[in-house]
UniProtKB/Swiss-Prot annotation:
It comes from Paraburkholderia xenovorans (strain LB400). Coiled coil: none annotated. This is UPF0246 protein Bxeno_A1262. It holds the Pfam family H2O2_YaaD. Belongs to the UPF0246 family. Transmembrane segments: none annotated. PANTHER family: PEROXIDE STRESS RESISTANCE PROTEIN YAAA, PEROXIDE STRESS RESPONSE PROTEIN YAAA. One of its GO terms (biological process) is response to hydroperoxide. GO terms for cellular component: cytosol. InterPro entries: YaaA (IPR005583).
Length: 260
């Protein structure tokens, strides 16, 4: 079983990592190709392309200039310890043990516009390049064209290392990022957990809570060494509970109702 997550825009390179073990991303050459194109852009062009402030554009202009195909402790940090958004607050990798992170290496993957597909302990140099960015490149009009089938092929290769009964992909990524995966070419079924909160008289997806819950679920799977999707139904962190009536074979719905 493999759980896929989206990356985060915010990054933490201030907190020292609590583990030394690290790996190098599989698609460094592809990332270098993208960086080469990004280096041709001015800060103003970056701001327009990514719809970000001038300050953020200048920061990323500098990041692209400093990016190196050589990764080390001086310029990079393990992905799940560097990402710092809602999902990663839920996953809270800095409190996972070395054994937990070793397990996550084989069962968690992060989709990335720049790096394609990351293992939790893959070293990450700071960047910003969302998967949905319409960045024209030699392979096509955007990053979906750039990555093509490569991400799906990499997931298939990892899935084949699992026992047949455990070959399932759990989609805890956003729609923007999961579009980089091609389910028809995936050699495993896909299960998508959905997290809903009660608000305004009905259950609905609230983005902040749903993102955090995806991280919580990934952590739950890692800490409990889950290898079958039905085990996810017991997830009950922070008040969520599996709703069988609202779910089906490919969508697991978890709901939470707290006092308004």
């Amino acid at each position: 079983m493999i759980i896929v997550l989206s990356p985060a825009k915010s990054l933490d390179y201030e907190t020292p990592p609590h583990v030394k073990k690290h790996t190098i991303p599989d698609f460094v050459e592809d990332a270098a190709e993208l960086i080469g194109g990004l280096r041709l852009l001015s800060p103003q062009q970056i701001a327009s392309l990514m719809d970000i402030s001038d300050q953020l554009a200048h920061l990323n202009f500098q990041r692209y200039a400093e990016w190196s195909p050589k990764f080390g402790a001086h310029n990079a940090k393990q992905a799940v310890l560097a990402f710092n958004g809602d999902v990663y607050e839920g996953f809270n990798a800095k409190t996972l043990s070395a054994a937990d992170l070793d397990y996550a290496q084989n069962h968690v993957r992060v989709l990335s516009g720049l790096y394609g597909l990351l293992r939790p302990l893959d070293l990450l140099q700071p960047y910003r390049l969302e998967m949905g960015t319409r960045f024209a490149n030699p392979r096509g009009k955007d990053l979906y064209a750039f990555w093509g089938e490569r991400i799906t092929q990499a997931l298939n290769a990892q899935l084949k290392k699992n026992a047949v009964a455990s070959r399932v992909l759990v989609n805890c990524a956003s729609g923007e990022y999961f579009r980089s995966v091609k389910p028809k070419l995936l050699e495993a079924p896909v299960i998508t957990p959905v997290f809903e909160d009660w608000k305004g008289g009905r259950y609905k997806i609230i983005s902040f809570h749903a993102k955090r819950a995806r991280g919580l679920m990934a952590r739950y799977a890692v800490e409990n060494r889950l290898d079958r999707p039905e085990q996810l139904k017991d997830f009950n962190a922070e008040g969520y509970a599996f709703d069988a009536e609202a779910s089906n074979d490919s969508t697991y719905v978890f709901r939470r109702r707290v006092a308004e």
